[in-house]
């Protein structure tokens, strides 16, 4: 980049100098034209082609004809041209010739001095001179102008040459600087290459040293291997001889053993032929004695085991008998507790329902009318009252509304005839409290939404001994509602797991289940003021509800 810039600067300087020289020459040429006295007609015809060729000054000089000043000017032009060419060759041989030097070059002078040009010019001068002649004053002025012009040309040429010289020196300095930079770069590259080659030489020397070490180690290993091979050869030779000696000794031992075995076989055959006659009897007697001993030992063991098992059997029988006694005692106590609970519940039911029969029936009928035959199944609650006094033992059944109003009315009116079971000749006040729970599931298609399970209370008072009372009770159950058990417990305590109850008719002994005894011992509190309605809501799936009927029997035994 720097070299290109320098070249551009040099070209610009040369162009400026050429422009200055050409402008000076143009001005001087115009000055000469002012002092030339020529014919306008002839000069116009001669000067026009000269202007077209760019050689106006030499064409105007033949106007002077055979004037000695013209010859001197031509000689001065030739000398200056020679001086300029010699200086240009010595100063800057590489530079192209200047247009001014081309203007004053020898070829131009040669052309101007050629015979054809001289003849044409002489003809023109003869015509011009024949018409007008130039005065001395004009020649003197022309001489002065030419002197001034030659001196200016000389100074311009010398200044231009000095400029070229300085430019050449600058260009030479720049080239030297570039060459020095290139030389420095090449020297640096060569030094780096020399350093790399030195490092490579060191690496090669190290690798050669390692190779020498490897070669020496391999030679030592080969020598050791040769020694080892020689030792192995000698060892195997000795081992082969040793194995052969051992083989010979082993073969001798085998021959001796074979000889001894053949002798033993012969002796054993002779002994067997002699002893074979008696060994069977001896072995049979020994086996028989051993079998007898084993049988005696086994029989003793079995007798001991039999005695132990018989003792264990007796103990088990005694334990079973004791457990039977405990069971009987427990059953007796449970019977007594059951009877006490039945009596207590019977008395409580008698006091509650003595004066409330008509009120309870009216209450259930009113509830049935309010709910309607097609309404959702919400059962009326049982109104219990504990403030009533104890009256004769006539216990009504707690009734629930059936699927229709007629069925509810019929069941309500049938209380005195079917639900109250009394015996006329009995003076005992014992009663049987039998709640019934229907646990079987029926068809969901025939169940009504309002049908729910209703426990029934049957009271037997003053019954005769040995009399069996059979009561047909119809109940409705709803397995979907979970409040059914709570409402049944609110009335009677618990739901019994059996469908028939055996009652022994004697006062101190009662039969009842454990849950019934617990319910009798801890009865639920019933508030007569609020009526405590034991309502049961219908379950989420009323399809499980079904109307069922069971036949329950109560047997009274003396």
Curated annotation (Swiss-Prot):
Coiled-coil parts of chain: 174-199, 299-337
UniProt keyword list: Acetylation, Cell cycle, Coiled coil, Cytoplasm, Cytoskeleton, Phosphoprotein, Repeat
Domain of life, per lineage: Eukaryota
Transmembrane stretches, start-end: none
Post-translational modification comment from the UniProt entry: Hyperphosphorylated during recruitment to procentrioles in G2/M phase.
Positions of the UniProt region annotated as Disordered: 1-25, 360-393
Modified residues (N6-acetyllysine): 521
GO CC terms in record: centriole; centrosome; cytoplasm; photoreceptor connecting cilium
Location of Phosphothreonine modifications: 23
PANTHER family: CENTROSOMAL PROTEIN POC5
Subunit structure: Interacts with CETN2 and CETN3. Forms a microtubule-associated complex with POC1B, CETN2 and FAM161A. Interacts with CCDC15.
Family of the protein in this entry: Belongs to the POC5 family.
Record-given protein name: Centrosomal protein POC5
Organism whose genome encodes this protein: Rattus norvegicus (Rat)
